[in-house]
């Protein structure tokens, strides 16, 4: 390079000069770190090379009409579901697969063995009493083949493209007891039982463009479901409250005039309005009542029911002038729950403004069993959590209404996407709610020991037993589920936003990804391609190092020396070195002999050809000290070599 060319580059800042030296320690190999990343999924007409849905993207549809009864005497649910399944795929379908996750609680389920230890209780699973294929006004009985938590139905004739099959299924099951019910169950309280009811009807498995039918068995991880509309009714004892996904459509039949008036007041109020107070919880009443709900464009619905619920609500202010209701139901002994609706309202409003508008009219937080579990526009949370934990869990679980309820990730394979993406948006909600009342987020999901997240992650990266983020969800044991699936995944996005791309590039890309894949089924490859394309960066080094592997980062300053005498410019060369396999952009802070300092931003490409690079710093005053990552923002495993001084 000619001297005037070097001078031209130095005038606009700092340029990395290739040093002839290589690292004398560590395992850094630039060809390995910066090799093209294999996405594991080739672009097609259904999924484009830039990460968007392709011009011929398709997905099937499942619409549900459900009528069920919850009988507290037998602790059972019985019901009938009519499923309208539309085949939008280009191929005819000879069979249909359904999920019957209640079979997870059978003694012979795969989930029992995969858990590694005996659960505290069992049920007989879900009984499919009658299964019919509806044709006009007639119905033909079909015999399902039951395989663990799946049911396969062979059709008399293949279902062609564009056609709809209608299934009518009568079923029943016993609701598992808390705590061994896990994601669903019942518990007793002083005011009566609380039921958190989920996986409560046969649900269609997904047939997609990647694997065809994808009915992985339910091993107590999460779900992959099709979108559609729901019309469901739940019959309970007359004095019970039912809180469900979607919108209650028969208020006049199940609520008193006083409750309806209070609900109308809540729809206009930014402050929490009590719909049913603790003093209005009353004892047993004869008879039954049916609560009727509808929800559009959802992949699932769940509900909670109890005679012991206090109920409050407030208006949510959503983009484009829309409003909705944030609601909470909880027993009187749930001491921290008086602010639950405030937490819920704030999270939904901020997530809507920052990332993507909340698509449904209501959001609900339920105190009861199955604590810390999410369903569309509804969360099941713990009764006894202290205030900070109640806030964090409420924000996290309702945040799942974005991931995976709106952006329909395959949780059963890629739990890190919904948990990590959701924990990521929670980090900023914790910082912003009520001027940081509960910030920063430090809980079981993110930096659980309370320190700097980039330090907290280091033992996980160093542990050879820790699985990489890109692991099938069912293979991640409980020890690593929160550290990897939640924490590492979320921190990867925080680092991508704050250190690699910057909010000015990350935020528009992330919003565009959500909008492109709303109510669709993106994969990890779709996300990686989208962020590469939208941000204008090849992030292969990051996807490989942080997501496909547990590579560690060790950047070092090894020398400070003056410019060669033949240079027309005055300045210093600061030698920075990569000593392990992960690299990322970093700030270099240089201090001059005159006491002033300057920050220099080094891109990841500083180490794209070699482990050691000389960074030119133009200044009349010589550099006497150089520090990498002075503000402690990146997960450098050895900070002792980040600081170099000539004095």
Residue ranges and their predicted role:
Residues 26-28, 76, 86, 114-190, ...:
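A surface-exposed beta-strand-loop module
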Residues 27-99:
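Early extracytoplasmic/domain-onset interaction patches
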Residues 30-41, 45-47, 61, 293, ...:
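Hydrophobic alpha-helical and helix-loop surface patches within well-folded domains
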Residues 81-83, 87, 98-102, 155, ...:
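Short, hydrophobic/aromatic-enriched beta-strand segments in well-ordered soluble domains
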Residues 93-138, 237-240, 591, 595-601:
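Solvent-exposed beta-hairpin/edge-strand motifs
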Residues 108-122, 172-230, 251, 632-647:
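Glycine/proline-rich low-complexity spacer/linker segments in large multi-domain proteins
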Residues 202-208, 212, 219-395, 424, ...:
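Hydrophobic helix-coil surface modules that form long, contiguous segments used
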Residues 243-244, 556, 562-629:
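Beta-strand-rich binding/interaction modules
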């Amino acid at each position: 390079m000619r001297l005037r060319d070097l001078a031209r580059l130095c005038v606009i800042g700092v340029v990395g000069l290739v040093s002839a030296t290589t690292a004398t320690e560590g395992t850094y190999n630039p060809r390995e770190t910066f090799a093209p990343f294999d996405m594991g999924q080739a672009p097609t007409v259904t999924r484009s090379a830039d990460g968007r849905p392709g011009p011929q993207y398709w997905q099937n549809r499942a619409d549900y009409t459900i009528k069920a009864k919850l009988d507290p005497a037998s602790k059972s649910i019985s019901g009938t579901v009519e499923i309208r399944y539309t085949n939008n795929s280009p191929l005819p379908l000879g069979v249909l697969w359904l999920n019957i996750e209640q079979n997870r609680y059978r003694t012979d389920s795969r989930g029992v063995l995969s858990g590694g230890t005996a659960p505290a209780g069992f049920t007989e699973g879900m009984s499919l009493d009658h299964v019919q294929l509806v044709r006009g006004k007639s119905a033909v009985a079909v015999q399902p083949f039951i395989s663990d938590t799946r049911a396969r139905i062979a059709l008399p004739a293949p279902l062609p493209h564009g056609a709809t099959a209608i299934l009518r299924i009568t079923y029943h099951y016993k609701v598992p007891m808390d705590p061994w019910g896990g994601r669903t169950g019942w518990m007793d309280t002083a005011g009566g039982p609380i039921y958190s009811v989920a996986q409560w009807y046969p649900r269609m498995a997904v047939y997609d463009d990647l694997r065809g039918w994808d009915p992985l068995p339910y091993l107590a991880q999460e779900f992959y479901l099709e979108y559609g509309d729901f019309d469901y009714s739940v019959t309970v004892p007359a004095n019970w409250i039912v809180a469900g996904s979607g919108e209650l459509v028969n208020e006049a039949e199940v609520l008193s005039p006083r409750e309806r008036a209070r609900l109308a007041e809540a729809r206009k109020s930014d402050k929490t309005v009590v719909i049913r107070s603790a003093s209005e919880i009353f004892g047993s009443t004869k008879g039954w009542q049916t609560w009727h709900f509808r929800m559009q464009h959802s992949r699932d619905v769940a509900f909670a029911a109890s005679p012991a619920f206090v109920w409050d609500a407030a208006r949510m202010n959503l983009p484009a002038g829309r409003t909705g209701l944030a609601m909470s139901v909880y027993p009187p002994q749930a001491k921290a729950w008086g602010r639950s609706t405030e937490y819920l309202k704030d999270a939904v409003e901020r997530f809507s403004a920052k990332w993507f508008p909340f698509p449904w009219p209501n959001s609900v937080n339920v105190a009861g069993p199955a604590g810390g579990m999410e369903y569309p526009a509804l969360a099941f949370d713990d009764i006894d959590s202290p205030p900070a934990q109640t806030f964090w869990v409420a924000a996290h679980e309702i945040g799942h209404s974005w991931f995976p309820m709106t952006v329909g990730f395959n949780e059963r394979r890629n739990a890190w996407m919904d948990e990590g993406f959701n924990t990521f948006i929670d980090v900023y909600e914790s910082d912003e709610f009520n001027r940081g009342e509960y910030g920063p987020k430090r809980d079981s999901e993110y930096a659980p020991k309370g320190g700097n997240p980039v330090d907290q992650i280091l033992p996980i990266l160093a542990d050879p037993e820790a699985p990489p983020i890109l692991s099938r969800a069912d293979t991640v044991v409980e020890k690593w589920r929160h550290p990897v699936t939640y924490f590492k995944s979320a921190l990867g996005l925080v680092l991508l936003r704050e250190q690699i791309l910057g909010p000015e590039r990350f935020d528009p890309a992330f919003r565009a990804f959500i909008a492109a894949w709303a109510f669709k089924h993106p994969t990890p490859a779709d996300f990686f391609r989208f962020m590469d394309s939208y941000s204008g960066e090849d992030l292969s080094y990051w996807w490989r190092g942080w997501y496909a592997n547990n590579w560690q980062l060790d950047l070092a300053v090894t020398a400070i020396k003056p410019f060669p005498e033949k240079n027309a410019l005055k300045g210093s060369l600061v030698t920075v070195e990569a000593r392990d396999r992960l690299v990322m952009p970093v700030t270099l802070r240089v201090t001059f002999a005159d006491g002033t300092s300057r920050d220099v931003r080094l891109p990841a490409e500083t180490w794209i050809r070699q482990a050691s690079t000389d960074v030119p710093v133009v200044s009349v005053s010589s550099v006497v000290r150089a520090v990498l990552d002075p503000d402690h923002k990146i997960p450098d495993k050895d900070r002792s070599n980040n600081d170099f001084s000539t004095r």
